Amino acid sequence: MEKLAAFILVLTLLCAYWQSAEGIREYSYADCTDVKGDSAHRYSGSRCFCYSPGTVIKWKDIWSTFKVNVSSNVDVVVVFPMETINCHHPDDLLTVMNCFVEHYWPSTVQRETSLEIPLVDVDICFMIKSPRSNTEYTLHVSNKRLNRMCFLLFVCGLILFFGARNICRSSLFFYTTGVSLGIIATFVFLTLLLRNFVPKRGLFLVLLGAGSGLSYMGIQRVLNEWDDIVTEHWMELLAYVLISGLFSFAVCYKHGPITNKHTLNFMTCSMQAVGIVLLYYGITFPPAYFVLVAVLLCWKILPLAWSLLMGICSLFYSFLALFRRRRRPTVRLLTEEEYREQGEIHTRASLDELREYCNRPGFPAWETVLRLRSPQRFAEFLRQGSHITQEEHQNHENHYGLGGAYYENVIFNNSSSSDTQSHREEAEDNSEDEIVGNSPPVLNNLPSPTIYPPTICPYPPVTYTPQPEPLDPEDQDFF
């Protein structure tokens, strides 16, 4: 979806550049008359004029235009741009593509008695056409000034581009767009409404394209005959707006706002493309527009490019990891002395934590004392005393210390097992024919099991007195 957004924005930028390249050509004709700002002169016949800004274009001039007004008793119009691009001898590939677009979708040439013409850093030429060569007219050219409509379009374009995500997820935008689409483009609205009944996606796209074409033709027809419709058929127009608006609102209210993630992303991309178009019509100086759009595209595409670069790097490192030999970490076993030292350290730390926990104000001391066998020993432990007695320590050292009973059993068991193994090897070397049938089996010296002291229950013994269970009413005697 991010790639689709970038493609839509780039396509919008190219279309805007094609349109701007047509009307911002540098015309330098020897027979054109130079005019200055805030000047009014009388002329006759069709002729071309060139206006020079006279000053360097500044940042505040990107929303500025100059106004050309012609007044006459007959139909005299201002034509801008005065001619189309030379498609017979194109200069570059962009001109060829622009000519191709111009051939199938010709742009409209402005023919009005008053025009707002944008500023460029070269002379701007326009033409005054009159029906006869002796027709006189008055031409008035004003200086550059801030075009409020262009500035408003620029602000709206920025708002749509940066706020497209929040706007598309707004319920107000959903209902407003649905009602407007139902009124203006009824065929498109009905096609989207009946989408679930169309079996194939290709057929749906064909129907959507046909509905869009019919809606466009209807809008063009209404705009061409707007005056007659408003004056003669205003009641029918009002009834159509009310009925289609209420029906569209009811359908939108039934289905609710859009929650599909892909649809919302597509709407966001379309909204950003509309914002780019508004920026194009809001900025009158084309270089400033292209710089701004380049910055916006970089801001939009950089996160996608960064994620793509990180994905490529991760794949490359994963590919290199297949050829690198994994080294297993060397593990060193602890010695007996290190094992004893770590045991003492961790035991001391655990005892300190236990002592700290028992000295807290919220510790249930009385309940704990009632459950202990020797509360005095527990109190001495809390006063930084030892957790074992001297006798217990001596018994532990005698059993597990150096020269203790535990290591003696281990040593003797190992020696007994080695003697048994040697006896087995000698018995295998004897002949198979010399078998002693009555010889008793040799018993293996098994290691004596480790004797552990009996466990001591920390809770005091409590005598259990069984309580008689009450009899049910059904079990009682009736006599």
UniProtKB/Swiss-Prot annotation:
GO BP, one annotated term: oocyte maturation
GO cellular component: nuclear envelope; nuclear inner membrane
Mutant lacking the gene: phenotype: No discernible effect on morphology, viability or fecundity. Simultaneous knockout of nemp1 and nemp2 results in viable healthy animals but both females and males have impaired fertility with females laying normal-sized clutches only for the first 3 weeks followed by a marked drop in fertility.
Keywords of this entry: Glycoprotein, Membrane, Nucleus, Signal, Transmembrane, Transmembrane helix
Signal peptide: 1-23
Stretches that traverse the bilayer: 172-192, 203-223, 233-253, 276-296, 301-321
Superkingdom field: Eukaryota
Disordered: annotated span: 414-479
Glycosylation sites: 69, 414
Start-end of Pro residues biased regions: 450-470
Chief localization: nucleus
Compositionally biased residues, Low complexity: 438-449
Coiled coil: none
Membrane topology: Multi-pass membrane protein
Compartments where located: Nucleus inner membrane
InterPro entries: NEMP_fam
Keyword Isomerase assigned: no
Family (UniProt): Belongs to the NEMP family.
Task performed by this protein: Contributes to nuclear envelope stiffness in germ cells. Involved in male and female fertility.
UniProt name for this protein: Nuclear envelope integral membrane protein 2
Originating organism: Danio rerio (Zebrafish)
Chain's gene name: nemp2
